[in-house]
Amino acid sequence: FDIENMVFSKKGHQFTENPVFISGLARSGTTMLMRYLHETGEFRSLTYQDMPFVLMPNLWKKLSFRKPAGELKERAHQDGILVSLESPEAFEEVFWRIFTGEQYIYKDRLKLLKTNIEVLDKFRDFVKNALLSSDQPDKLRYLSKNNNNILRLGYLKKSFPEAKIVIPFRDPLQHALSLLNQHIHFSGIQHENKFSLDYM
């Protein structure tokens, strides 16, 4: 992250100050909402192509050979959502884990995050780096989908007072059934694959 900030200058760019942050409970429709917005072409989100160095999107873009999007494949959730290398995803959580992980991740729960000016400035740089790595850094808006954003709404609003925060709600019975199905599905996977348990 520090190397990215030293190497890639943001001077001369007029970045948009009105990103969109999507948050909500798991299985509430946040992924589909993000994808619909991303498909308008007006937003920059981190995608699978930014992996594994999501804190250095510009440096990784220079060093890696950008592959074509490739064929669409169903994601691990087996919920009918198809993904490719160009699909947006909630990779922003890496930033929060690295810079504030010990403040909100507990063994038995997650905790609301108190704002910290130094981290707030780093987050603004993180968003600008993501925009800078796009083909139209001065035109696109940053788009984030992260269910854990609910823990840091104060950060988001202090970082970007003009931001829009969207929290979708789903029919409670459908929502509960979807959560149960995913719990059963991933419990089976994690029983067979320890890496999956650590990753999730």
Q: PLM features: residue spans?
A:
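Short catalytic/ligand-binding loop motif for oxyanion handling, primarily in non-cytosolic enzymes
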Residues: G29-T31, P52-L55, L151-L153, L173-S178
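Hydrophobic anchor at the beta1->P-loop junction of P-loop NTPases
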Residues: I22
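P-loop (Walker A) phosphate-binding loop of NTP-binding proteins
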Residues: L25
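A conserved segment at the C-terminal end of the G1
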Residues: T31-R44
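Conserved phosphate-donor/acceptor-positioning beta-strand/loop module used by diverse small-molecule
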Residues: K145-N147, L156-N181
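PAPS-dependent sulfotransferase catalytic core
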Residues: N181-M200
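Extreme N-terminal, non-catalytic leader segments
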Residues: F1-P19
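PAPS-dependent sulfation machinery
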Residues: Q49-Y142
